[in-house]
């Protein structure tokens, strides 16, 4: 399997950023690591083994983004506005700088077609879902596993314009029925899953809230509630019960 590590300068973040690429050609998949994770975690958690049938056959290329969660969502105790402004800068790094990089590499491989799939576990799932729902014009698939989709766990009762714009439960709930994104959501595919085992309680509750919003608004997202034997650590590590379910989820997209 071809693996590349690429470093480039981000004007949005005023620093060098790195990302890793697995494969060449096919559908671009943008992976986000767990809370405080790094761009090399996809390989470190042995996820290429699960994705290898698609990567090796040229059906997809996985791009692994870096995070700044420890300066944003996970920087508990720091000023809330500072935290969410940092996240918003990272968001613009993804959509304004990394997405064009992905397009450039896909064009070099002769396989660029509009639309990128987002994928992540835990906090990576939150990023995957948020980017998909905020920019369905850029991202046409989403696979989110065991994530939080509102602000309560990280910001409590604090909510400003940027927190609102990064919580799908909030902004989807208030999206007008005639918003052009509605047609995009309903012509694309998104899969959000959560376990019902140990350490999934808060994540399960947040997933149900998003499920309720999507049902009420007529947004076609598939929600799956995996078994009571599926705990958070298994999903994040992608071993044990999580591994076959992950492969099954990929096939649905």
Predicted regions and their residues:
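Non-catalytic cap/lid and distal C-terminal segments of serine-dependent acyl enzymes
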Residues: 1-253
């Amino acid at each position: 399997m071809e693996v590349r590590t690429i470093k480039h300068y981000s004007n949005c973040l005023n620093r060098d950023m790195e990302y890793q690429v697995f494969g060449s050609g096919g559908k671009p998949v943008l992976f986000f690591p767990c809370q405080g994770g790094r761009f090399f975690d996809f390989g470190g958690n042995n996820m290429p083994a699960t994705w290898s049938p698609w990567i090796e056959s040229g059906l997809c290329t996985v791009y692994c983004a870096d995070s700044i969660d420890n300066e944003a969502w996970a920087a508990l105790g720091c000023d809330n506005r500072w935290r969410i402004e940092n996240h918003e800068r990272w968001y613009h790094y993804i959509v304004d700088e990394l997405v064009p990089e992905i397009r450039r590499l896909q064009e070099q491989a002769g396989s660029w077609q509009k639309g990128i799939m987002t994928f992540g576990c835990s906090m990576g799932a939150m990023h995957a879902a948020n980017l998909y729902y905020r920019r369905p014009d850029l991202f046409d698939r989403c696979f989110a596993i065991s994530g939080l989709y509102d602000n309560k766990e990280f910001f409590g009762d604090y909510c400003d314009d940027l927190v609102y714009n990064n919580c799908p439960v909030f902004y989807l709930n208030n999206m007008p029925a005639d918003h052009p994104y509605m047609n995009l959501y309903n012509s694309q595919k998104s899969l959000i899953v959560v376990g019902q085992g140990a350490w999934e309680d808060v994540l399960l509750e947040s997933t149900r809230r998003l499920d309720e919003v999507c049902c009420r608004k007529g947004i076609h997202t598939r929600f799956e509630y995996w078994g009571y034997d599926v705990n958070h650590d298994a999903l994040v590590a992608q071993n044990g019960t999580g591994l076959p379910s992950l492969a099954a989820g990929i096939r649905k997209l």
